[in-house]
Every structure is written in C-alpha cells, then in structure tokens.
Amino acid sequence: MFDCSMKDPSTFLSGEEMTKRRTPCELNNWVPTVFNRYRESNEAKAYLRLKKGLCKQFLEEVWPLALLTKQLFGDSDQVICEPVLGNQKYDALIEDRRGDAPIQIKVEFTIAVDGYDDHLRMEVLNDKGSANAYGDISVSGTKHTGHKIDIDRSGRDRDELTSNAVRVVTKALRGKANRPYGLNHWLCVKFDDRIWVPNKDDTEAIRASVSSAKQALNLDFAKVFIVGSSGDLLWELT
C-alpha cells in the first residue's frame, strides 16, 4: 500500500507496483489512486507532468492499458493485464481466459501528441499554474542563459482542431510502420480527445480520415486501436 508520508515524488511509484498483474477492473480502480498521489504538492504535480521517473511509462503505457481494457473487457475477471517495463517490442501483456484456451496478446502503446510542444506547455503550467492548450509557442534564450517560453492566447477553430487530431494520430501510427511485430500484437494509440475533438459530431469524420491514412501504412499488427484520454472514445481501425 502507498505510504502517504513519503514526500519525494520519485518514491510515489515503483516498478513492482506498476507491473502487478490485475484484472481490467482492478487496474482501472488503481490508476486514479496514482493520479491522486501526484496531486499532493506542486512538486509532485510537476514531476508527473514532466513525466519524470516511472511517470512516463505510467502515463504512456499503463494508463492507456487501463483505458483500453475497460472498454474492451469491462468487469471481466477472466482477463489479466500485465504492464511490462523494458525495451521489448510490447509494453503490456493481456491474457484472455474467456474462451476454451487462454490467449496471450502483446500490446504496443504510443501517444499522439506533439512531444516537444507538450513538454513546453507543461513547463509553463508548472511555472504559472495555467497554459493555453491551443496557442502557438515561442522559445527564446539558451540552455545557459535560461529559456523563456511564451504561449499566445489564441484559440483554434473547429476545422483546425479536427485536422490536428488527424495529424497527430496519423503521425503516431506512422512511427510504428515498417517494423516487424506479428499477429499476436496489438497497437494502441492514445490521444487527448478532451482537447482535440471539439464536438462529438466530428468524431466519425476524424475516425474516417485516420482509417484512410492507416491504409497507406505497413503496420504489422493484428488489431489497431485508438483510445481517448476521456475514457469514452475507443476506435478499432480496419
């Protein structure tokens, strides 16, 4: 059990705890408790936002595993999820015992995000307490003199948001193309639909565009899923 007396954010999460085998229900009950740990202080919030230590794997692999399995398997206790740390060609194992014979699925995760821009927004959020999710970013200064990050206050119209959603998801898919995986591998792309899907009416248009882009890519996976941070969006791309 997590010791709330620990103040160093690097101690809030261990590899042993993160890779524990859980049912989808157990995993989805555990994930919010981890987020709560990092709400204890501004230091802890910054540690999570900048994906330090094991937070990177938690945000980019374990949380998406929870989102994916909740929607696919619900409360089934015949499915076991096991995050895997390391440099192998998968980030998690799913053992599906619902049929006559257990099936093991290897899942590779990736995130649809502009990584450098996202990091800069998190720096501004940590420094100022808020950051425009849509504004253009400019950086001045150097590593030695200190850099200054400015985010303008502009927004994005509906067409810009939907086109950007297609762009970042397609970019994430492209990053996994032309690599050998196999028929027992799934690919899951997580993106923040809370930001990039302005209207539910846009969902199918974005999905259609992403599906079309996928057809042009050589992806060696049995199934490809797109999962949203909201917990409400799950697409299987055909």
Language-model-detected regions and their locations in the chain:
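Metal-dependent nuclease catalytic core centered on acidic motifs
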Residues: 2-78, 110-238
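A short acidic/basic microdomain associated with nuclease active sites
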Residues: 71-93
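An acidic- and aromatic-residue-enriched active-site/binding cleft used to recognize and process polar
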Residues: 85-88, 97, 110-112, 229
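Short, well-ordered loop/turn elements at secondary-structure boundaries
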Residues: 87-90, 101-102, 182-183
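Conserved catalytic cores of phosphodiester-cleaving nucleases, focusing on short active-site segments
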Residues: 92, 103-111
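Active-site beta-strand termini and strand-to-loop segments that position acidic
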Residues: 94-100
